[in-house]
Design a protein with these regions (language model features):
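Intrinsically disordered, low-complexity, positively biased terminal segments
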Residues: 1-141
């Protein structure tokens, strides 16, 4: 048996295994610690995502229903809306967590289908404001 251990950055930079329909090798990602957004509106306020154009997030969160729904990001503030004319980015809270906290890039999440939009260019200004390195969770007990 051959074992190759890659730096975590390789796993997130090129989602090779996720794109293969039937991989001939087994790739195992050993989770260390996990993060989860439990208040998307508060997180976006802290991140100060002041983008020039309004965009919308359509978030699914089955575990925390208050955290899911449709939101508009306008002037650095995320507000819940019923409907919107703004370009929409949709996906689960896990994918939004990975993107907004810098674990995965938007392009990678779009490529694997974890996030979906018809207008990816509209979300590049948001992506440009985000941290470009993986988060470090130093408290482990």
């Amino acid at each position: 048996m051959f074992t190759y251990e890659a730096p975590t950055a390789d796993v997130t930079a090129v989602p090779v295994v996720q794109l293969m329909t039937e991989p001939k090798y087994q790739a195992v990602v050993k989770p260390y610690m996990q993060a989860r957004i439990v208040n998307l509106e508060a997180l976006c306020q802290v991140l100060e995502l002041d983008v020039p154009e309004t965009v919308a997030f359509d978030v699914q969160d089955e575990t925390a229903p208050w955290n899911g729904g449709r939101f508009e990001l306008r002037g650095g503030t995320l507000e819940r809306v019923v409907q919107t004319e703004a370009p929409q980015l949709s996906g689960g809270i896990q994918a939004f967590t990975q993107w907004l906290l810098g674990y995965k890039r938007l392009s990678s999440l779009l490529l694997t289908g974890e996030l979906r939009t018809n207008t990816p260019a509209d979300f590049e200004p948001v992506d440009a404001l985000l941290t470009r390195q993986q988060p470090v969770l130093a408290d482990y007990f």
